């Protein structure tokens, strides 16, 4: 579902489920000239809260560290990069909502995601 949405939006998928020593990056893709590190969050029920709400400050910081590790390893530190989120919320009614949030947070943020 997330990959289909990203492709429809013009992203070029580079890699997915990238495992590093300290964690995993869900999707790495290019959106024009920008390298995007994409976190995919799904909530199976509204009782669990929204997918967006589940991305804590701790998770954001972890994603930043993972991305920096990846960029160093691939010698891409000069690349333009950003963090996007694909949020998938399944409602109790059976409906599913999927949302792409570009540039959700960055290295300099105080910890609050832009779309909250």
Language model: regions and residue ranges:
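Acidic-basic catalytic patches of nuclease active cores, encompassing PD-(D/E)XK
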Residues: 1-16
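Conserved catalytic motifs of the protein kinase core domain
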Residues: 24, 33, 96-97
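Acidic active-site catalytic centers that drive phospho-/nucleotidyl reactions
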Residues: 24-26, 39, 59, 84
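Conserved catalytic cores of phosphodiester-cleaving nucleases, focusing on short active-site segments
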Residues: 27-47, 63
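Mg2+/Mn2+-dependent nuclease catalytic core
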Residues: 43-69
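Domain-level recognition of nuclease-like catalytic cores that cleave nucleotide substrates
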Residues: 73-116
């Amino acid at each position: 579902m997330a990959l289909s949405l990203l492709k429809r939006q013009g992203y070029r998928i580079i890699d997915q489920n990238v495992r590093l020593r300290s964690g995993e990056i869900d999707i790495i893709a290019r959106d024009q000239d920008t390298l995007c590190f994409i976190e995919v969050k799904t909530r199976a029920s509204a009782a669990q809260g929204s997918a967006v709400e589940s991305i804590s400050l701790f998770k954001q910081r972890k994603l930043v560290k993972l991305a920096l590790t990846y960029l160093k390893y691939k010698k891409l530190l000069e690349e333009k990069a950003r963090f996007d989120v694909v949020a998938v919320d399944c409602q109790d009614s059976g409906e599913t909502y999927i949302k792409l949030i570009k540039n959700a947070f960055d290295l300099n943020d105080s910890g609050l995601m832009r779309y909250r």
